[in-house]
Amino acid sequence: MDPAFIFITGGVVSSLGKGIAAGAIGLLLKSRGISVVNQKFDPYLNGDPGTMNPYQHGEVFVTQDGGETDLDLGHYERFTDVPSSRFNSTTAGSVYRAILDRERAGGYGGATVQVIPHVTDEIQARIRAAAATTGARVVITEIGGTVGDIESLPFIEAIRQIRRVLGKERCLFIHLGLVPYLPSCGEMKTKPLQHSVKELLGLGVQPDVILCRSERHITDAVREKLSLFCNVERRAIVENVTARSIYEVPLLLEAEGLGALLCERLRLFDTCCGGQVARNLGAGGAQSAVLGAGGTVRTDGGLHPAAGQGAEPDLTAWRAMVRALYYPRRELTVALVGKYVSLADAYLSVSEALTAAGICHRARVDMRWIDAEEICSVQDAGHALADADALVIPGGFGVRGIEGMICAVSHARVQNLPYLGICLGMQIAVIEFARNVLLLASAHSREFAVDTPHPVVDLLPGCVDTPTGGSLRLGQYRCLLAEGSRARALYGRGEVWERHRHRYGLNAAYRARFEASALRPVGVDSDCGAVEVVEHGEHPWFFGVQFHPEFCSRPNRAHPLFRALVAAGLERKDSRS
């Protein structure tokens, strides 16, 4: 069966949550038995996000095949549980590079290379490739940036051409825009969104669905006005109100009738739930559609029973997960000591993995972000971590804040504070233990001190220390866990696959010293033998992992390491109360 394509654009302002909406739509379709794949097209000229400043771009999400991609791919995976690849994240820079390389190789036969058709053709080819390589029934493509930005024009033109070829039954446009509320007049204003749609219409793209991003529920008058002036059917004016959690968004959109509407417009009924077609939720069903009894969503007309018919989605487990998130029975505080803590998106997958672990234990995780540069001694660390029930040090690069992290780990080790070190966090644990337990006072990493006499952390074989992209150990690798280790027990198996993004690791020359100590290597790469897991045998819960477990965590399937960390934190809290 020929694939269908959904394109999501954004208007008025950036950072409205197109990626969350795209992931939520993927979940709504997948819950109806429809195979989906999400992808992101960014208009910036960087080759990929790998070398971009975390303060500007947020985290780099690593795919199974080693792609350094936009953080929205993390949203896609957490919502749909469909693994992404490097090809699901495309930048304008990678598009232009491919075209210029092809031109230099004579691929265009001497023709004049232009934005149209060459750039737009390359974009279209990459959009279609997602369907060809995955076999997905629906390809959901998010176009980054904001409509009206000059750099987005080739992408908008490319999707216009795709619609011209495929028609409305195989191609659907969703435009997400802000509908602000002005307290001064007590009204929601539609004019910014109207002008955004006008800009899109000027580029030849007529939205089929408008997602109204708002802080308040939109009124019927707002729906009517947008329907009239944006030339969009009233039932396709969909509220996208701010939720307590991003994981409620799919349920809110389903209550608005969006899932059934998409199935109807793209004629997906025959592929839904084995061909069983059921009527969409009727009037008054919005509350149960979202959370069931005790839910938070209004039932006074926010649902549109005229949205047509579509297969009933199976969102039972998702609703249960959101209920567990909203109604915790316990709480704990997890401290995160890092380099980029002023921007939460820099550690987005870590925070979402902790949230998922909290859901698993019906516990609310209060995340306390601590700037590593503000810790100058072990005493400082003690004050900063006094109320923490667990500590996480996530990944990072560069020397800034390293000594503060070492002090934090020293406090955690001595005070029996549950600790999880991720990537750089494992290296910090190794350095701290070498200095204070193995008595190698000048121990360090060659990344931060090239001339250290005790480089307990060093470059891995085959890696090159360069700031340029493509020089890291990237992607999914197999790790073998030692018999009798705690790591093996909490995973429940001896072989695990985890994603990596690093070039440094435990120096093999010092491995024997650690094996004879309390901080033992218990997980190694199955091919090269590099140490990937260390655990402290004399500590209640102390692990360092060279990989990034946060990338494999899901809101309804917490990663074993985070799940066990939260359990240890809760146990510590109980013991102190």
From Swiss-Prot:
Q: Domain (Glutamine amidotransferase type-1): give its ranges.
A: 333-575
**Residues reported to bind Mg(2+):** D72, E142
| Regulation (activators, inhibitors) | Allosterically activated by GTP, when glutamine is the substrate; GTP has no effect on the reaction when ammonia is the substrate. The allosteric effector GTP functions by stabilizing the protein conformation that binds the tetrahedral intermediate(s) formed during glutamine hydrolysis. Inhibited by the product CTP, via allosteric rather than competitive inhibition.
Gene Ontology BP, a term = 'de novo' CTP biosynthetic process
Q: Which reaction does it catalyse?
A: UTP + L-glutamine + ATP + H2O = CTP + L-glutamate + ADP + phosphate + 2 H(+); L-glutamine + H2O = L-glutamate + NH4(+); UTP + NH4(+) + ATP = CTP + ADP + phosphate + 2 H(+)
Give the region (Amidoligase domain) as residue ranges.
Answer: 1-268
| This enzyme's EC code(s) | 6.3.4.2
Q: In which pathway does it act?
A: Pyrimidine metabolism; CTP biosynthesis via de novo pathway; CTP from UDP: step 2/2
Q: Which GO terms describe its cellular component?
A: cytosol
Q: Recite the UniProt keywords alphabetically.
A: ATP-binding, Glutamine amidotransferase, Ligase, Magnesium, Metal-binding, Nucleotide-binding, Pyrimidine biosynthesis
Q: Where is the active site?
A: C423 (nucleophile), H548, E550
Identify the residues that bind ATP.
S15, L16, G17, K18, G19, I20, D72
Protein residues bound to L-glutamine: Y55, G396, L424, G425, M426, Q427, E447, R503
Give the top-rank taxon of the lineage listed in the UniProt record for this protein.
Bacteria
Q: Where does UTP bind?
A: S14, K189, T190, K191, P192, L193, Q194, K225
| Binding-site positions, CTP | S14, D149, I150, E151, K189, T190, K191, P192, L193, Q194, K225
An annotated Gene Ontology molecular function: metal ion binding
User: Could you describe the subunit structure of this protein?
Assistant: Homotetramer.
- Outline what the protein does: Catalyzes the ATP-dependent amination of UTP to CTP with either L-glutamine or ammonia as the source of nitrogen. Regulates intracellular CTP levels through interactions with the four ribonucleotide triphosphates.
Q: Which family does it belong to?
A: Belongs to the CTP synthase family.
The misc remark on file is:
CTPSs have evolved a hybrid strategy for distinguishing between UTP and CTP. The overlapping regions of the product feedback inhibitory and substrate sites recognize a common feature in both compounds, the triphosphate moiety. To differentiate isosteric substrate and product pyrimidine rings, an additional pocket far from the expected kinase/ligase catalytic site, specifically recognizes the cytosine and ribose portions of the product inhibitor.
> Could you tell me what this protein is called?
CTP synthase
The organism is Treponema pallidum subsp. pallidum (strain SS14)
